[in-house]
A protein has these predicted regions:
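General structural signal for secondary-structure boundaries
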Residues: 33, 39, 140-142
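N-terminal beta1-alpha1 ligand-phosphate binding loop
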Residues: 5-33
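Anionic-ligand binding patches
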Residues: 2-6, 11-15, 49-201
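A short beta-strand-loop structural module common to alpha/beta enzyme folds
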Residues: 36-46
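Surface-exposed, flexible loop/turn segments at secondary-structure boundaries
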Residues: 23, 43, 127
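Short glycine/proline-centered loop/turn elements that form peptide/ligand docking sites
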Residues: 2-4, 22, 39-41
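A short coil-to-beta-strand element that immediately follows conserved catalytic motifs
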Residues: 35-36, 78
Length: 201
C-alpha cells in the first residue's frame, strides 16, 4: 500500500522557523511537516509610537524576517512571528519582572482583550505578512490567583504575562473568539493555507 502524501508538498523546500519558542515549535510540528529552527540574533522589537497597536505584531515579525532573509537559500521558506496582547490602545509585551506580570494580569482581569500574532513568510524572492486576531475574555481575577500563577509559572516569556494553555487560562478565561492556537503563539491554520499558496505558485 502506497504511503499517503502530505497535502503540503514540501519535498523540494526547506522550512525554517525563526523562533526560540517551544510553543511555536510544537504548534508547527503539529502540521506534520519537517522544519529546522533558527534562532535569530537579538532583534529590536520596538515599533513607532505612531503605529496602531493592532499593527505592532506584524511590524515586528517583518523586522525579524528582514534580519534573516538575506541568508536564505533558494529552496528555503522562512517563518517569523510575534505575538502581542492589546488592551484598548495599549500593547502588552513580555513582562520585565514578576511585579510587571502581576500588573499586566490585573489590567486584563475582568476585561476582553485581543491577542494578535503577526506572521511573515519569506523566500529569497518574496515575502507575505499577515495578522490573526483572537478576542479573549478574562473573569475578574483575585490577587491570590494572580500571585499563585506568577509565582508558580513565571510567565516572563509570554506576551501579556499569561499562557492560555496554563493554569490561569483554565481558571480565568471565560471565552475566546477566534483561533485558540493563535493565543498559544502561532495561527497554524492560516500558516498552512499561506504555505499552500506559496507551494502552488
Amino acid at each position: 500500500m502506497n504511503e499517503m502524501k502530505h497535502p503540503l508538498n514540501l519535498e523540494r523546500k526547506k522550512l525554517l522557523l525563526a523562533s526560540a519558542s517551544p510553543r511555536r515549535k510544537n504548534l508547527l510540528a503539529a502540521l506534520d511537516v519537517d522544519f529546522d529552527v533558527r534562532v535569530l540574533p537579538d532583534i529590536d522589537e520596538t515599533f513607532p509610537d505612531s503605529l496602531p497597536a493592532s499593527e505592532a505584531a506584524e511590524y515586528i515579525s517583518n523586522k525579524k524576517a528582514s534580519a534573516y532573509q538575506h541568508l536564505l537559500a533558494a529552496d528555503d521558506i522562512l517563518i517569523t512571528a510575534d505575538t502581542t496582547v492589546v488592551l484598548g490602545t495599549l500593547v502588552l509585551g513580555k513582562p520585565v519582572d514578576d511585579a510587571d506580570a502581576r500588573h499586566m494580569l490585573r489590567m486584563l482581569s475582568g476585561c476582553v482583550h485581543q491577542v494578535i500574532t503577526g506572521v511573515t513568510i519569506a523566500t529569497t524572492h518574496s515575502r507575505r505578512s499577515f495578522s490573526v486576531i483572537t478576542d479573549v475574555a478574562f473573569k475578574t481575577l483575585s490577587d491570590e490567583e494572580i500571585d499563585y500563577y506568577v509565582d508558580t509559572y513565571h510567565p516572563l516569556d509570554k506576551a501579556g504575562a499569561y499562557g492560555i494553555q496554563e493554569w490561569i487560562g483554565h481558571i480565568g478565561v471565560t471565552s475566546i473568539r477566534g483561533s485558540y492556537f493563535n493565543v498559544v503563539g502561532l495561527p497554524v491554520q492560516r500558516i498552512y493555507e499561506e504555505l499552500r499558496k506559496i507551494i502552488n505558485c
